[in-house]
Amino acid sequence: ALPTYTPESPADATR
């Protein structure tokens, strides 16, 4: 499942 927040970097989604 993908989060609503989609950052440019996949690793940035950890925050």
From Swiss-Prot:
The lineage of its organism: Eukaryota, Viridiplantae, Streptophyta, Embryophyta, Tracheophyta. It comes from the Eukaryota. Its cofactor is Mg(2+); Ca(2+); Mn(2+); Co(2+). One of its GO terms (molecular function) is transketolase activity. This is Transketolase. Belongs to the transketolase family. The keyword Lipid biosynthesis does not apply. Catalyzes the transfer of a two-carbon ketol group from a ketose donor to an aldose acceptor, via a covalent intermediate with the cofactor thiamine pyrophosphate.
